[in-house]
Amino acid sequence: IEPRQYWVVVGSNGSGKSAFALALQNELPLQEGVYRNTFKNVQSFSFEKQREILEATLKNLNNDDTDPDFFGQTARETILNGGSELTFCEQIAEKLGITYLLDRFFIKLSTGETRKVLLAQALLQKPDLLILDEPFEGLDQQSVQDWMAMLNELKKESLKKVLAWVMLWAVVAVG
C-alpha cells in the first residue's frame, strides 16, 4: 500500500479482512516472511470499536454515583478524545456534515451519526493510513449511499495529502 492509494479489500465473513487490518496496524504477530510498513500513523475504525465505546459509556453510566440526567460525552468530546485541537475538530465536523451533532450526547446518536463521529475522531489524528473495517455494517441503503458520497469527497481531498485508505468490506454469498 502506497501513499495516496485507495484500496478496497473484499471477502466473505471469516476470510481474514480484519486480521489483515490488524497486521497493517502491527497488532498481529508475523508468522513468517517479511513485513515492511512505512506508515507512521495508522488509524482505524470499525463496528467493534463503536460497540466498545458504547459499552464503556453504558458501564460508566450504570453506577450509583452517576447523575441520572448525565449521558456521558458529547460528540465533540468523543472526537477530541482527550485532545485539545478544537478548531481542527470543528473543521473535520464541517467536512463530514456533522457540526449539528457536536453538542449532542454520543450515546444518543444513530448508528450512522456515531460512525461519522468515529471517522472524525480518526481523521483528527491526521493518519497517513486510514482503515475502515466494515464501515457500512448496520446502515440502511440510503445511509450507505450517503457514506459512499462522503468517502469519495474525502478521498479526492486526501489525494492532496499523503493519506492512504483501506476499506474492508464483507460480501455475503447468495444462493
Segments the model singles out, each with a brief description of its role:
Residues 119:
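Hydrophobic anchor residue at the start of the ABC signature
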